[in-house]
């Protein structure tokens, strides 16, 4: 459905898309640090894993939402979850389904952009307080499609996507933001003013973050890193290892810049 929508926007006929073929292709391509999709289900017996894969594949074929697929695997509260495939926590199953689906969707999107003639992709992270530091720094990154090209998911529960673009990465339109760590549904309606809105589609996470208030910045970075950001002149990308995409610890940062830490009393 997602790929067909992109073709529709481009005024082109979409080819038939099979969940079976997509899953096979996605399973051959590593995700998030070299893992294969089979490794998304740690500790699950082989027979059960195959059933989970079937439910995901069938759910995608039938246009089911993440929640509908999760319900089929986890079961329903009315049945005391006895009608689900697995007896695991909701968060664990949720992470597995979302990561697997993101990997399959990412593979489909990339094929779609290539079919539409794009030679570059642009990473688009989510502008909110739940986005990982690594994805925030990847936001707006432009890559040429081909050898060495990276695609999401970059970690479990990764929400970053990619869009086709030209070499300059410029796109039209707006992108949404939520200046809060809570999902929109968890923010009371009387607290949403100023927290939810839209910005130009070419605004990066770093640019957007710089425009947020102190409380949001401090909560996302933590008090010590916030001080380094505001008073020490640290750009956001200095807090993240460019190779692994993982945040540096304060101990690691201090080891290479003890002078700034001393000046700020950290």
Q: Predicted segment positions?
A:
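N-terminal leader/targeting and assembly helices and adjacent pre-domain segments
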Residues: 1-79, 173-266
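Acidic, glycine-rich two-metal-ion catalytic cores of nucleic acid-processing enzymes
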Residues: 82-179
């Amino acid at each position: 459905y997602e790929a067909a929508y992109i073709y529709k926007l481009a005024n082109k006929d979409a080819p038939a898309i099979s969940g079976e073929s997509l899953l096979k292709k996605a399973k051959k391509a590593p995700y998030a640090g070299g893992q294969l999709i089979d490794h998304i289900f740690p500790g699950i017996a082989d027979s059960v894993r195959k059933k989970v894969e079937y439910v995901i594949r069938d759910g995608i074929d039938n246009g089911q939402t993440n929640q509908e697929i999760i319900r089929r695997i986890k079961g329903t509260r009315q049945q005391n979850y006895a009608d689900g495939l697995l007896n695991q926590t909701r968060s664990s199953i949720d992470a597995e389904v979302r990561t697997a689906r993101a990997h399959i969707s990412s593979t489909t999107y990339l094929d779609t952009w290539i079919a539409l003639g794009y030679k570059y992709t642009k990473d688009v992270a989510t502008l909110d307080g739940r986005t990982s530091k690594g994805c925030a720094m990847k936001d707006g990154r432009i890559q040429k499609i081909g050898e060495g090209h990276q695609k999401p998911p970059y970690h479990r529960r990764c929400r970053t996507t990619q869009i086709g673009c030209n070499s300059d990465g410029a796109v039209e339109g707006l992108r949404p933001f939520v200046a809060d760590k809570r999902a929109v549904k968890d923010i009371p309606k009387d607290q949403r003013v100023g927290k939810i809105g839209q910005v130009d589609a070419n605004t990066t996470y770093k640019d957007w973050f710089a425009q947020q208030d102190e409380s949001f910045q401090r909560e996302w970075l933590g008090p010590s890193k916030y001080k380094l950001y505001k008073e020490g002149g640290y750009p956001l990308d200095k807090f993240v290892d460019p190779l692994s995409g993982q945040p540096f610890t304060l101990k690691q940062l201090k080891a290479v810049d003890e002078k700034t830490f001393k000046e700020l009393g950290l």
